[in-house]
Amino acid sequence: MNLPAALFTPSWPAELELAYARHGERTTPVRRRHLGPLRVQKHLHAEGPEVCQHIIVHPPGGIAGGDRLDISAHAGERTWVQLTSPGAAKWYRAAGVARQDLRLRVEAGATLEWLPQETIVYAGAQAELHTQIELHGDARLFYWDIVALGRPAADERFASGHFQAALDVRRDGRLLWHERQRVSGGDGLLDSPIGLNGQPVFATLLVSGEVDNELLERCREVNIDGVRGDLSQLAGLLVARCLASEALKARAWLIALWRLLRPALLGREAVPPRIWST
């Protein structure tokens, strides 16, 4: 159920701690600790025993002022973990700050895919997201996030509030990616050509590894109406960005890249989780 963008005051802390281990050819959860309304559904092995998929759910349906979400996932050696969500995360208008802390740790020989659906930040929300990712040895990462500011379909611009995000990725303690974002409601950057250029949605994709020029060009040729995006190959990390008119279009662009990059960098064809189709 979609709740109205009212001014919420109660706070609701929630924690979720996940860990995975490899047993023979099978990746299995070995720790599932939760506090408050954060949960995971029963794990799935839709691609076979090697890949363990978990769907993270937040039954309240939205995050409001004073809420604190703390999520951690540890992919043990040689595991393959895929984490996604059943729907958009909604950050509601509120008088206080709401915060999410995400910590991902990926051990040598392991693969972690963080593939949530979009984050919708309502006008008047005060949303702060902090993400730390630690890779060890030859660990592999496929990470994306999609952020929609306001609700353009409801003619709601992001005229007040703020969205703030911090993202750090390290391999064996060495910093690979360091990013800080802050967008305030009504800021000129929302419409500036050096900012969001009037687009309400932006998305980021980070993939460990390097691709050749041919595959990079194939990725750049992905054409989704209403999306402007590009990719950059850094040392050991591929970065993709886009601006979009709708969250669904940004997600379609990311999925198209995932279909191209997953076989090349992770050695497995892309199989969309069934929850994305419901």
UniProtKB/Swiss-Prot annotation:
Pfam families named in the record: UreD
InterPro entries in the record: UreD
Any GO molecular function: nickel cation binding
Subcellular localization, as worded in the UniProt entry: Cytoplasm
UniProtKB keywords: Chaperone, Cytoplasm, Nickel insertion
Keyword Cytoplasm: yes
GO cellular component entries: cytoplasm
Predominant place of localization: cytoplasm
Top-level lineage group: Bacteria
PANTHER family: UREASE ACCESSORY PROTEIN D
Subunit organization: UreD, UreF and UreG form a complex that acts as a GTP-hydrolysis-dependent molecular chaperone, activating the urease apoprotein by helping to assemble the nickel containing metallocenter of UreC. The UreE protein probably delivers the nickel.
Family: Belongs to the UreD family.
Function: Required for maturation of urease via the functional incorporation of the urease nickel metallocenter.
HAMAP family to which the protein is assigned, alphabetical: UreD (MF_01384)
Protein name: Urease accessory protein UreD
Native species: Ectopseudomonas mendocina (strain ymp)
Gene giving rise to this polypeptide: ureD
